[in-house]
Regions:
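PAPS-dependent sulfotransferases, especially Golgi type II membrane carbohydrate sulfotransferases
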Residues: 1-62, 66, 76, 184-189, ...
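N-terminal signal-anchor transmembrane helix
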Residues: 66-91, 117-121, 126-127
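Short His-Asn-centered micro-motif
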Residues: 89-91, 219-223, 308
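Post-Walker A helix-loop "phosphate-sensing" segment adjacent to the P-loop in P-loop NTPases
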Residues: 105-115
Length: 399
């Protein structure tokens, strides 16, 4: 059992190598320099090579970004989305990736793929030559689990914002031992109006570029969007939201494992993981407090929910229900592809985790509101009668 009370048996992933591309390889030169400057260039000596390499790549990205602006700038500006997006939301490690991959089986929907998200500044002009070259260095599996990875698979649009130089809580992964610099961007609730408009403009620009590529209604998946429903509805009044949730006793250890692995692979520091457990506990509360505050704002018929456990047990039934509740059209369009997808994943192996009883009690104490709302059994042999509702003023670095 590790010091954070989580014992992990990992399946899949990959072994890190210096030449493996990083999340930040698509950022422009000045965007990258700003992130390092914001953290006072506190780079570990052993990670100096990574910092220099990404800096050099940043020059190349800046050049390609200029080319894309010259070639596609006006077209992107005048492009309209086919329809307001469909947002798949939920906490990290709750099944958002699985649900995203199911939705994009529908040929009527488009999505931002991994290349677009990791090269958002120039993917329209560089994909044809750069994606195959860099693809030779890419791992075949995601670093955190047994899910396949390649440039054409759907990806979190939050990484696109990071690489566009927009502040994001994900950028804290680069300097995991430093105080958070972009905490407010998890919920967007306390972001100055000028910066919020910049965020909206960058996000919409990216979605327009994706629309040029796909020509379809876009399905997006990003856990931070769970906290941003108010802003997203301001931008996209007809947006649909699909919220997936999962047993907290499965979410917590998997999230700890996620941030530990990503900090180890993607950081310019050697992470010490101090305070990680508290960040995960607090961020979960922040996320669902923001989600519940925004829930009444969502018009009827624009939000549907599904549990990870139900989706895995009977994906066809649950997907058909989601289509019906959100009025997404004829489910028969997707049914054959969904059955094939399910068959292909029949041998999928998940990571396994063991939780120390003391950690289970702490999770039950801090997240009791979630256990009760979604009907998950609380750990036994623990008196939770006096467990408080999570503070609405809590603030912590997003995990």
């Amino acid at each position: 059992m590790s010091k954070n009370g989580v014992k992990a048996k990992e399946v899949g992933g990959y072994r890190d190598r210096p030449w493996i591309p990083r999340f930040w390889d698509g950022i422009t030169f000045w965007g990258w320099v700003k992130v390092m400057a914001d953290h006072r260039f506190k780079i570990a000596p052993r990670r100096l090579g990574m910092a220099i390499l990404i800096t050099l790549i940043g020059f190349f990205n800046s050049f390609l970004a200029l080319i894309q602006k010259l070639v596609y700038g006006r077209k992107i500006a005048r492009t309209a989305l086919v329809d307001d997006p469909i947002f798949i939301i939920g906490h990290w490690r709750s099944g958002t990736t699985l649900l995203h991959e199911m939705f994009i089986l529908d040929p009527r929907f488009g999505f931002p793929d991994s290349y677009a998200c990791f090269a958002p500044n120039h993917f329209l002009v560089s994909r044809w030559f750069l994606a195959p070259l860099v693809g030779l260095l890419m791992p075949k599996m995601r670093p955190i689990d047994n899910m396949p990875f390649d440039w054409n698979r759907p990806q979190e649009d939050e990484f696109a914002l990071c690489n566009m130089g927009v502040p994001s809580p994900y950028l804290s992964l680069i300097f995991p031992n430093e105080p958070p610099r972009y905490d407010a961007y998890l919920t967007l609730e306390n972001v100055p109006q000028r910066e919020l408009e910049r965020w909206k403009k960058a996000f919409l620009t990216f979605l327009k570029a994706v629309t040029i590529q796909s020509g379809k209604r876009i399905v997006l998946k990003s856990p931070p969007h769970t906290c941003r429903i108010k802003v997203l509805l301001e931008m996209f009044p007809r947006a649909k939201f699909v919220h997936i949730y999962r047993d907290p006793l499965a979410v917590y250890p998997s999230t700890i494992n996620l941030w530990k692995r990503l900090s180890k692979d993607e950081a310019l520091q050697v992470p010490h993981y101090q305070g990680l457990e508290e960040r995960v506990l607090t961020t979960f509360c922040r996320m669902y407090e923001a989600f519940e505050r925004a829930r009444p704002l969502v018009p009827t018929g624009q939000l549907a929910e599904v549990s990870y456990e139900a989706l895995v047990a009977d994906p066809e039934r649950e997907m058909e229900r989601l289509y019906r509740e959100l009025d997404l059209g004829d489910f028969e369009t997707i049914r054959p592809r969904l059955r094939e997808f399910i068959a292909e994943r029949s041998n999928y192996k998940r990571n396994k985790f063991e939780l120390d009883p003391a950690v289970q009690r702490e999770i039950a104490h801090r997240w009791r509101f979630f256990f009760e709302k979604y009907g998950y059994p609380l750990p036994e042999s623990h008196d939770l009668a006096s467990a408080p509702t999570p503070s609405r003023t809590s603030s912590s670095r997003p995990a």
